[in-house]
Amino acid sequence: MLSRFPLFALITLSAPLALSAPALAQQAAQAAPAAGQMNSAQIAAFNQAVTDFTAGQTAQQAGDNAAAAAKYEAALPAIRTAVQADPARIDNVNFLANALYADAAAQGALGRMDKVIALYTESAPYWRKLVEAKPTDAASRNIFAGILIQMGNQKLVGGDKTAADPLYEEALALARKSVAENGKDAVSRNILLSALIGASQTANDPALSAEALTMGKAMLSDGTIDAMNKPSIEAMTGTKAG
């Protein structure tokens, strides 16, 4: 059983956004709430948040995660206000989800893992709403699945299998959809494998353990397994891949 082996797929640092900052910030700026929904000070704060977010992305891409985190933290309150003012405006939901995710990446690079989990937890409802609104957006779906897995890992490390299980199960459904759409995509397959490894330890389902082992062996063999999943599968198989 997989539960005999240590869970190596623990909290890992978020990758920088694939979407360029100027494009996302411009999209968010265009989606700024109308004057009737927010007062002039709130609109000005939102516009400043777009500027701060863009500066944060620039700093993050240059490797200055401390500056990036500071800019993201400065931007977040106004973006939250915009979403609260008009929860149905999906462009602003997208902006908030990505800003929280980018902040988590910067905080993770600084070793502030408690902050990462808090940001992930806050972002999850927005990612869920975004994925539901854009069912063909595989990139957002994969980001959300990865966030759920990290949240599940944190619960599992803390000994709370009951709380971890639904997080893994939701991630598993998302990852299966991505792999069904593009079975050759290594990123999607690694997300699915991570979800299987986690769910195997909370669901008490031998079929999930077997699926994780079979998939992990194949990915070890073809070299597509990532650094997060590799130690878990090596522990399961009792082998050390080159």
Predicted segments with their positions:
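Structural motif corresponding to the intra-repeat A-B loop/turn of tetratricopeptide repeats
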Residues: 62, 103, 110, 151, ...
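Terminal, low-structured helical/coil segments at or just beyond the last alpha-helical repeat
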Residues: 30-34, 198, 205-242
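Flexible helix-coil transition and linker loops at the boundaries of alpha-helical arrays
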Residues: 37-42, 80-93, 128-141, 176-187, ...
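N-terminal leader/linker segments that initiate helical-solenoid repeat arrays
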Residues: 23-70
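Single-residue signature of alpha-solenoid repeat helices
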Residues: 68, 75, 116, 123, ...
